[in-house]
């Protein structure tokens, strides 16, 4: 049974890879690195177009996908079509060229986790979170050429960006025409996004997407932006 949240359409010259959903770290997750990387290794096309609409997920799983794309022999073009938030914003930067739809959204913030244990366990977890942040800062800094302290503060603040803003910071290279936001946003719980601390400009983008249009029966299932209680305790997410 094909994976519902990522799809690969291979052709001789160009292959399209669609990453729509939560980025996990096991075979049970919507976008799991093992299946995706196994399929990427079989692609012989000269160009890979990666289409992203994702709320993020596992730091470890996302880093594995980022590295697989970055090290692939093909020329990688990334297209942010709806949302590239959290770990998805890292995967997007694996592209040799990064395109972002004019009505798409880009977000960066700090890794988070939760669990149980004594004070020593939580100190170790805090150290792991600090280490994870440094690995992400390496990627953001390399792509954007922004000062590391500036990016770190943006992560601390949880920064949401329009395409114009993301391009201004150097995270994306080109702004492309609007995509059908209504179709893209059905993959994400847009109401959960609008309930977050978004700038008014980004809330307007969500409203403009006409997300309440009748479903044509062909869209993928809506998947809510995961809460901390829904994630595995032992993993670090972003």
Label each residue range with its predicted role.
Residues 1-87, 95-236:
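N-terminal organellar transit peptides
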């Amino acid at each position: 049974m094909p994976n519902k949240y990522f799809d690969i359409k291979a052709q001789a010259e160009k292959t399209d890879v669609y990453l729509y959903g939560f980025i996990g770290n096991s075979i049970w997750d919507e976008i799991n690195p093992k299946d995706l990387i196994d399929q990427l290794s079989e692609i012989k096309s000269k160009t890979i177009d990666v289409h992203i609409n994702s709320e993020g997920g596992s730091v470890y799983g996302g880093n594995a996908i980022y590295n697989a794309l970055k090290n692939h022999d093909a020329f990688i073009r990334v297209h942010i079509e709806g949302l590239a938030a959290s770990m998805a914003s890292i995967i997007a930067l694996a592209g040799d060229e990064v395109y972002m739809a004019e009505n798409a959204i880009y977000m960066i913030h700090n890794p988070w986790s939760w669990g149980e244990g004594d004070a020593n366990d939580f100190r170790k977890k805090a150290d792991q979170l600090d280490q994870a942040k440094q690995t992400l800062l390496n990627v953001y800094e390399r792509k954007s050429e922004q000062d590391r302290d500036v990016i770190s503060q943006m992560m601390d603040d949880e920064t949401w960006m329009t395409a114009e803003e993301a391009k201004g910071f150097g995270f994306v290279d080109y702004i492309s025409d609007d995509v059908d936001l209504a179709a893209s946003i059905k993959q994400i719980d847009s109401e959960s996004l609008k309930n977050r601390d978004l700038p008014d400009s980004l809330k307007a983008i969500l409203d403009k997407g006409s997300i309440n249009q009748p479903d044509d029966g062909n869209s993928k299932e809506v998947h809510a932006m995961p809460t901390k209680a829904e994630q595995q305790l032992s993993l670090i997410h972003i």
